[in-house]
């Protein structure tokens, strides 16, 4: 197994495991030739000696020693006895960490169905058997018999369900003196399901289904295609349908379901141990009942209980009553450990913490460029620490790493100067979960800011589906030159204007920006302080607003010699004034124009300081491009 773990591989494939494969996982030969792996006892540890019980759920012979280089009985201690198998207890002297990957197995006295394939959506067992899920459940949980071979009976058919009373009636007919019935076989429970699955010839059924699909349509055709798809997948993966019925159950390594002693001498244990214990107890009881040739009804009841125990172990609560522990809390099964946000995949494998990353709340940074983000100093010094230390040593400010770290801890002014130099031109990646499309991660040039929040340009929010009501974002530092150049060329926010899904612009003003634009250009008849004043230039008007002599929404006259476009044509002269120098002032609705001999000398337009600021901001932005 170690050799397999060390070797490189391209992908991981999840497949159905055969009973032989499950045995191989848990079964192994000790150096002295003894084969171990089967867990036969429900005990965990001896509460007097606090040592694992042999052949139990924490058995050292099966899973390896609890202490490094020490056998169960204590005869062999120290690393010099590496690989020796103790003659007294049969434990191999090795490291205790093998208990994290060595598995065991439970050999079941009767086969049981896998609850995922029975109660999953869709139910693969019912699809393969071409039976209703309700009927398959009736068979599995010992409520109905199924005809495995109708023999010469004219009133029976293959896979027909029979109640207890119906089967008793048929039995009486079979064993009657004048009976001509023979070859009739019925079954119940997972054994019957296993037999039905074993009789399926996948290639023949697939060929037959393809012919039927060509001739059928509608709902029937969809059902046939669904069944064919499942069968084709079984053929492609070289899996047998009867592997969905378990005869051997794997026992996961003990260090993945630990038992911990608490201060008061009590023990805290993983729920899995309780679920495994239920399976082993019922399995052992069933074995004893079979040995003593107990009545069929008792054996059948025990088989049903074993099926329910295995169901609870694999997926507690999927079918029937949920198994609960102390305080009526549902026990966590294998499925509960794997699935969901807190499961093994999303929490521990996909959601691993990585170096050179940080996380903080985002706030709006209105003065940032679209390709910039505000990075808190506290976070930046931690993320870029190796780069800062390297530069401090290269500049001769310190002689070694330890001195550089002390300088950083003291927050010496030279550190901030060096940090500024380091982050210049070094992009960082910002990610907001959930990352549903590629624009969920983008690159930005960091700008050092005070505080503890990451500042984000409001225009990139739609791409991240972010808002500023408490959202958090993660920061990652690309380390290699290739990663940095890729981030700069492909992932910089200013290169991601269009949505990759639709091709439409994803960068669009929203929320505060739209509100701000509306507020600047809106009318407010009540705020008319300084109205009807004349200004010779845009800077004069803005200065007057900043000094508080004019309200933002007050109508003023601004000298402007460019073209004026209004939503309604402004060509109607309301009034004309003739001045002493012969020039004429024409009063329009939105402007006043002074002309002489047909030439325009000056033009004043009616506007507000808010609209002047809005127009100037857009003009400056366009000039900057």
UniProtKB/Swiss-Prot annotation:
The record's remark on the cofactor is: Binds 1 Mg(2+) ion per subunit. Binds 1 Zn(2+) ion per subunit.
**Which InterPro entries does the UniProt entry name for this protein?**
DNA-dir_RpoC1_gamma (IPR012755), DNA-dir_RpoC_beta_prime (IPR045867), RNA_pol_asu (IPR000722), RNA_pol_N (IPR006592), RNA_pol_Rpb1_1 (IPR007080), RNA_pol_Rpb1_3 (IPR007066), RNA_pol_Rpb1_3_sf (IPR042102), RNA_pol_Rpb1_clamp_domain (IPR044893)
Q: Record's superkingdom? A: Bacteria
**Gene3D superfamilies with a match to the protein in the record:** 1.10.40.90, 2.40.40.20, RNA polymerase II, clamp domain, RNA polymerase Rpb1, domain 3
tRNA-binding among keywords: no
Q: What are the record keywords, sorted?
A: DNA-directed RNA polymerase, Magnesium, Metal-binding, Nucleotidyltransferase, Transcription, Transferase, Zinc
Which reaction is this enzyme known to catalyze?
RNA(n) + a ribonucleoside 5'-triphosphate = RNA(n+1) + diphosphate
What are the GO MF terms of this UniProt record?
DNA binding; DNA-directed RNA polymerase activity; magnesium ion binding; zinc ion binding
SMART domains per UniProt? RPOLA_N
EC numbers, comma separated: 2.7.7.6
One term under GO cellular component = DNA-directed RNA polymerase complex
GO biological process per UniProt: DNA-templated transcription
Needed co-factor(s): Mg(2+); Zn(2+)
**Transmembrane annotation, as ranges:** none
Residues given in the record as Zn(2+) binding sites = 71, 73, 86, 89
The UniProt record gives the binding positions of Mg(2+) as: 467, 469, 471
What does the annotation say about its assembly with partners? In cyanobacteria the RNAP catalytic core is composed of 2 alpha, 1 beta, 1 beta', 1 gamma and 1 omega subunit. When a sigma factor is associated with the core the holoenzyme is formed, which can initiate transcription.
According to its UniProt entry, what is the function of this protein?
Answer: DNA-dependent RNA polymerase catalyzes the transcription of DNA into RNA using the four ribonucleoside triphosphates as substrates.
Q: Which family does it belong to?
A: Belongs to the RNA polymerase beta' chain family. RpoC1 subfamily.
Its protein name is DNA-directed RNA polymerase subunit gamma
Q: Which organism is it from?
A: Rippkaea orientalis (strain PCC 8801 / RF-1)
Q: Kindly list the organism's lineage.
A: Bacteria, Bacillati, Cyanobacteriota, Cyanophyceae, Oscillatoriophycideae
């Amino acid at each position: 197994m170690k050799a397999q773990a060390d070797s490189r591989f391209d992908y991981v494939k999840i497949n159905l495991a055969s009973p032989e494969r499950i045995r191989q996982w848990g079964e192994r030969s000790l150096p002295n030739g003894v084969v171990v792996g089967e867990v036969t006892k429900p005990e965990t540890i001896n509460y007097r000696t606090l040592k694992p019980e042999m052949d139990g759920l924490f058995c050292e012979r099966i899973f390896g020693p609890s202490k490094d280089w020490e056998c169960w009985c204590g005869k062999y201690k120290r690393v010099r006895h590496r690989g020796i198998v103790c003659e007294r207890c049969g434990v191999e002297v090795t490291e205790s960490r093998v208990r994290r990957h060595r598995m065991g197995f439970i050999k079941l006295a009767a086969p049981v169905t896998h609850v995922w394939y029975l109660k999953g959506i869709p139910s693969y067992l019912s699809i393969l058997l071409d039976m209703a899920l309700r009927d398959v459940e009736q068979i599995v949980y010992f409520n109905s018999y199924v005809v495995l071979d109708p023999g010469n009976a004219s009133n029976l058919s293959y896979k027909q369900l029979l109640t207890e009373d119906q089967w008793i009636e048929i039995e009486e007919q079979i064993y009657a003196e004048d009976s001509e019935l023979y070859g009739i076989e019925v079954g119940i429970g997972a054994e019957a399901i296993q037999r039905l699955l074993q009789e399926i010839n996948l290639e023949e059924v697939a060929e037959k289904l393809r012919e039927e699909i060509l001739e059928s349509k509608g709902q029937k055709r969809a059902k046939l295609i669904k069944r064919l798809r499942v069968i084709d997948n079984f053929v492609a993966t070289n899996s047998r349908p009867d592997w969905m019925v378990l005869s051997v159950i794997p026992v996961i390594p003990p260090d993945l379901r630990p038992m911990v002693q608490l201060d008061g001498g009590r023990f805290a244990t993983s729920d899995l141990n309780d679920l495994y214990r239920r399976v082993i107890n019922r399995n052992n009881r069933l074995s004893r009942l079979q040995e003593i040739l107990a009545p069929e009804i008792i054996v059948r009841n025990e088989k049903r209980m074993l099926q329910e125990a295995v169901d609870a172990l694999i997926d507690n609560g999927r079918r029937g009553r949920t198994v609960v522990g102390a305080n009526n809390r549902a026990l966590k099964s294998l499925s509960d450990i794997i699935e969901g946000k807190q499961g093994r995949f999303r929490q521990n494998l996909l959601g691993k913490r990585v170096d050179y990353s940080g996380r903080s709340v985002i706030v709006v940074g209105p003065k940032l460029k679209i390709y910039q983000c505000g990075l808190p100093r506290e976070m930046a010094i931690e993320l870029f620490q190796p780069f800062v230390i390297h530069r401090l040593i290269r500049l001769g400010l310190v002689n070694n790493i330890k001195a550089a770290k002390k300088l950083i801890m003291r927050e010496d002014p030279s550190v901030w100067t060096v940090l500024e130099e380091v982050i210049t031109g070094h992009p960082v990646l910002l990610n907001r979960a959930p990352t549903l499309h590629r624009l969920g991660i983008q690159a930005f040039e960091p700008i050092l800011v005070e505080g503890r929040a990451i500042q984000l340009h409001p225009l990139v929010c739609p791409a991240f589906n972010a808002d500023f009501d408490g959202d958090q974002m993660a920061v990652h530092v690309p380390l290699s030159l290739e990663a940095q150049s890729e981030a700069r060329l492909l992932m910089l926010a200013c290169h991601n204007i269009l949505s990759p899904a639709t091709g439409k612009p994803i960068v669009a003003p929203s929320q505060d920006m739209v509100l701000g634009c509306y507020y600047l250009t809106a009318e407010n008849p009540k705020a008319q302080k300084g109205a009807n004043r004349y200004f010779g230039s845009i800077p004069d008007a803005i200065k007057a607003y900043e000094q508080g002599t004019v309200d933002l929404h007050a109508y003023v006259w601004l000298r402007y010699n460019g073209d004026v476009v209004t939503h309604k044509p402004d060509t109607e002269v309301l009034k004309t004034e003739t001045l002493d120098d012969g020039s004429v002032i024409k009063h329009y609705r939105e402007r006043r124009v002074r002309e002489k001999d047909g030439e325009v000398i000056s033009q004043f337009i009616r506007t507000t300081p808010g609209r002047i600021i809005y127009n100037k901001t857009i003009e400056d932005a366009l000039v900057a491009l």
